C-alpha cells in the first residue's frame, strides 16, 4: 500500500452544530465509507484464506516446496499484470476495474473451496486457482490506490489513511484469528468458502462508488504511451525507486519466511494452525496500534521515520528461526505490525503529496511491480533453500537481508530529507470532490502478501 459532490457531506451550519447532530468527519464521505467497509469485509476473509491455503496444500500431502509453488503461482501473475492494471485504471472508471477483479477472485476462491471440501485437490489445480486470484489482485491494487488518493483531501490525508488502515487491519486481526481457528476445527475448505463470499460482498459495495468528480482523461495515446509516462514519473524520483528496490527484497524474504516457513514451523513446533493464526492476529493488533499512533503523530521527515520502522520486520523471521514460544512470536509480530504501519501511513502520505492524481495508478503499478517482483522467486525457492542449508539458516538469512537493504536505502539523501509539506498545498482540491470518498494499500504488508495488504 488509495467521489462526487453529490456524495459530499456538505457544509455544517451553525444551527446544526448547536443541535449536536452526530456527523462523520468532513472527509469521511460516501466513497470513503464504502471503500472502508469493503476493505474490512475483504480482510476478514483474506487473512484467514492465507492460512487456509498453506494448510490445504499440506493436507493434500504437499511439502514445503509445494507450499512455495502455490504461493509463487499467486504472486507471479500479480507481478506480470500489475503494469497493465495500472495503465487501465488510469483510463477507465476505477471502480469498474475493482468490481471485475473482485468477481474473478470470488470465483477462483469458490472453486478452490469446492475442490478442498470434496476431495484432495491436485497441485496443478491449486496453482491455477491461486494464479487466477493473483491476476485479479494485479488489476485491483492500482485501481484501489488511485481511488483512495482521489478521495482524500490534503489537510486530512494523514488521519484518513491511518483510520482507513486501522479499520482494515482490525478486520485482519479477526480474520487471522478466526481463520486459524476454523482451519483447526473445520478444515481449510470452509475458510476458502468464506473468503469467496467476502469477495462477493465487497464487490457489491464497490459497485456503488461514485467517480463522477474525477475528470476524464483527454483522448490520445495507448497503453504503451501510458506505461512510458508512468515510468518517466517513477524514475524521476530517487526516493521512490530506491524504496521500491528496498521492498523488492524485504517483501520477498519476509513473504517467503511467513508464507512458507511460518506455517511449517507452526505445524511442527507450535501446535498447528491455531497458534499461527494467533501470531498473525497479533501482527494485526500491532498494525492497529501503529495506526492509532499515526492518527496523532505527523513526523516531519516522512520517509526517514518510515524507513527506520522497516528494521523491525526482521524480527518475525528471527523469531521463527529460534523458534520462540507462541507468546514470544506474538510479541515480535506485534512490534513488526506497529512498525510497518508507521511506514505505511508515512509512505501513503508521501505519495499523496508528491504524485499527480492523474498519474497515480500508473506510478502505483510500478511501485507494486517492483516491490513484488522477487516474491514469486523467493517463495518458489524457499523449499529448495531449506533443503540446502536448513530452515533455521534460511530464516536467519531472511532477517539479515531486511537489515542490510534497509540500512542501504538510508544512504539516499531524498529518503533522509523528504519533509511533510503544508497540508494546504497537497492533495486533491476539496471543492472538486476531495471530501467525498476514501486498500491496502501502502506497501504490501509482509504478513499480508495479498498486499493491502506486506
List where the protein language model places each region.
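Alpha-helical transmembrane-bundle signature of multi-pass membrane transport and export proteins
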Residues: 2-444, 449-454
